Amino acid sequence: MAFTPLHDRVLVRRVESEEKTAGGLIIPDSAKEKPAEGLVIAVGAGAKDDDGDRIPMDVKEGDKILFGKWSGTEVTVDGEELLIMKESDILGIITDEAAAKAA
């Protein structure tokens, strides 16, 4: 099933966190927090301003993002648990450090 978010909403797949700490300790599932990083799966067309013009989205499909701990609504699409949230719930886009240094 294809899913297209409306307006300024984005569909996000959570990116799982590490299962070990830097010191080598294994973190049990019960102690893990839900990750606040995700991969943008789909984006809406953008909200409309007062004149009815579309406001372009800052994120695009494939962006790795950081969002608030309680952001979004959990939805199931094709048996996969995803999040749908407004673009304003996204705190930032995570870029590859090597690519950022080259720019």
Curated annotation (Swiss-Prot):
UniProt keyword RNA-binding, yes or no: no
SMART domains: Cpn10
Broad class of the protein's primary localization: cytoplasm
Keywords in alphabetical order: Chaperone, Cytoplasm
GO biological process, one term: chaperone cofactor-dependent protein refolding
Entry GO terms, CC: cytoplasm
Subcellular location: Cytoplasm
UniProt key word Cytoplasm: yes
Ranges in coiled-coil conformation: none
GO MF term set: ATP binding; metal ion binding; protein folding chaperone; protein-folding chaperone binding; unfolded protein binding
Top-level taxon: Bacteria
PANTHER family: 10 KDA HEAT SHOCK PROTEIN, CO-CHAPERONIN GROES
Record's subunit section: Heptamer of 7 subunits arranged in a ring. Interacts with the chaperonin GroEL.
Similarity annotation: Belongs to the GroES chaperonin family.
Function: Together with the chaperonin GroEL, plays an essential role in assisting protein folding. The GroEL-GroES system forms a nano-cage that allows encapsulation of the non-native substrate proteins and provides a physical environment optimized to promote and accelerate protein folding. GroES binds to the apical surface of the GroEL ring, thereby capping the opening of the GroEL channel.
Name the UniProt record assigns to this protein: Co-chaperonin GroES
Gene name of this polypeptide: groES
